[in-house]
Amino acid sequence: MVADPPKGDPKGLAAVEPTANGAPAQDPLEDSGAAVGRCCSSRDQVRRCLRANLLVLLTVVAVVAGVALGLAVSGAGGALALGPARLIAFAFPGELLLRLLKMIILPLVVCSLVGGAASLDPSALGRLGAWALLFFLVTTLLASALGVGLALALQPGAAFAAMNASLSSTGAVEQTPSKQVLDSFLDLLRNIFPSNLVSAAFRSYSTSYEEKNFNGTLVKVPVAHEEEGMNILGLVVFAIVFGVALRKLGPEGEPLIRFFNSFNDATMVLVSWIMWYAPVGILFLVASKIVEMDDVGVLFASLGKYILCCLLGHAIHGLLVLPLIYFLFTRKNPYRFLWGILTPLAMAFGTSSSSATLPLMMKCVEERNGVAKHISRFVLPIGATVNMDGAALFQCVAAVFIAQLNRQSLDFVKIITILVTATASSVGAAGIPAGGVLTLAIILEAVSLPVSEISLILAVDWLVDRSCTIINVEGDAFGAGLLQHYVDRTEQRGSEPELTQVKSEVPLGSLPAPNEEGNPLLRHSPGAAGDAGACEKESVM
């Protein structure tokens, strides 16, 4: 029987009524307090998530705002209304970001590779390098095949063939004799072994052609010259070999190894500072590039199917092919890995440069995706130099597009030639804006297509090249993640014989029962076991 409620308590809140199973009922005040506590806890979790991913959100917002601002300024008159001086001032914040990123590329690449190569055993270094190059080669071949298949299926150049004469006449520029395939590979080998390390920091070797008159006949003559741009391939090779040499020195090389490691750590601190300026720079980089275009609508209307083919291929390769390869080998969620590198991907879209994205990519794969420093700082600089999945796919689409444009059929031999040449030439593509277009002429020459049609590709390269850069840096990151998984499995296999030997020496029956009194090392946790949430994970590196 329930007692009468006391005075001042007409609803009987002071009385505790038993429930059906005899347990006392929960106090409503305690319920409200628990609800408030859960609400505060969820707010804290949301706040921690926002704080941890603030740079990602700011970068994505900057990209969207840059597109909106560029379209708004273009609608108000664009570059003609601004004038040359105001256009330069409008693009200045983005130019400043590019200069800051390029400033730290040289010390970051050299120091990270020297330290990474010196920290690895030469045999392990060879295995890691071989696996990395194999992964990059296979993914580039897959990207090339995907590009050719999409271009043959969607026929982007067939509908555009009727408009070819008018657009080619308005957009064509004077063409210099194009580079031969053999000379391109020889230039690649020359750049691997630079004659001067100081000049390799800002120049690279290239072969150009001049037409000279010999007895009334015009002959293409190769001429060697140094072109502006860092010879990053030569610096990468030198840094790796130099790091191996320091390891061979033993104790005598330790001070120099510590110097390069400290230099690299200080450079990463600079990277973390620069990244907070990145959203501002990306906003104006994207906006200024859209403003510089004469008529974005006309370009999309005339070359829309070609753009769609390139972007669709990049989306399939970046969202399906690369994640599927990562999942098949690691059995881990690839899209969680992608979320960890979302900021570098947005940076790649804004800067359109694999090399400029390298510092932030190193920071994110180490801190957010758990890749060891010696792996990321060894694999990522190599990937930024030789892994160009996006460029290979775009070059294959462009080659098939130009063939359809000129009503030239592609037989099986020519398709294989496009695949092989695109895969090989993408290795030599510079990690700079429009680097893939520079090597497209090699593919066109290999299948006897007119190089003059590159002017059409250049008209929309400002958009396609940004998509290429995203795929390039994503492939580098997945390569580092796969190598980290390979190293982890190798270490586990190396420790298994020791564990088996220890277990066989002690019979199971002689072990004490794992209770609290007999084993003081056991401690019961009050909370439930499980992984921490993705937003609560922090780096311990």
Swiss-Prot record:
Listed A to Z, the keywords are:
Acetylation, Amino-acid transport, Antiport, Cell membrane, Glycoprotein, Membrane, Metal-binding, Phosphoprotein, Sodium, Symport, Transmembrane, Transmembrane helix, Transport
Residues modified as Phosphoserine? S495, S504, S539
The record's annotation in InterPro entries points to: DAACS, Na-dicarboxylate_symporter, Na-dicarboxylate_symporter_CS, Na:dicarbo_symporter_sf
Q: Which GO terms describe its cellular component?
A: melanosome; membrane; plasma membrane
**Glycosylation-annotated residues:** N164, N215
- Which positions does UniProt annotate for Na(+) 2 binding? T385
Q: Which residues lie on this side of the membrane: Cytoplasmic?
A: 1-52, 118-131, 250-258, 330-334, 366-374, 484-541
> Can you tell me which residues bind Na(+) 1?
G383, N387, N472, D476
Which residues lie within the region annotated Disordered?
A: 1-32, 493-541
Q: How does it assemble?
A: Homotrimer.
What family does the database annotate?
A: Belongs to the dicarboxylate/amino acid:cation symporter (DAACS) (TC 2.A.23) family. SLC1A5 subfamily.
Q: What does this protein do?
A: Sodium-coupled antiporter of neutral amino acids. In a tri-substrate transport cycle, exchanges neutral amino acids between the extracellular and intracellular compartments, coupled to the inward cotransport of at least one sodium ion. The preferred substrate is the essential amino acid L-glutamine, a precursor for biosynthesis of proteins, nucleotides and amine sugars as well as an alternative fuel for mitochondrial oxidative phosphorylation. Exchanges L-glutamine with other neutral amino acids such as L-serine, L-threonine and L-asparagine in a bidirectional way.
Name of protein: Neutral amino acid transporter B(0)
Annotated organism of origin? Oryctolagus cuniculus (Rabbit)
> What gene does this protein come from?
SLC1A5
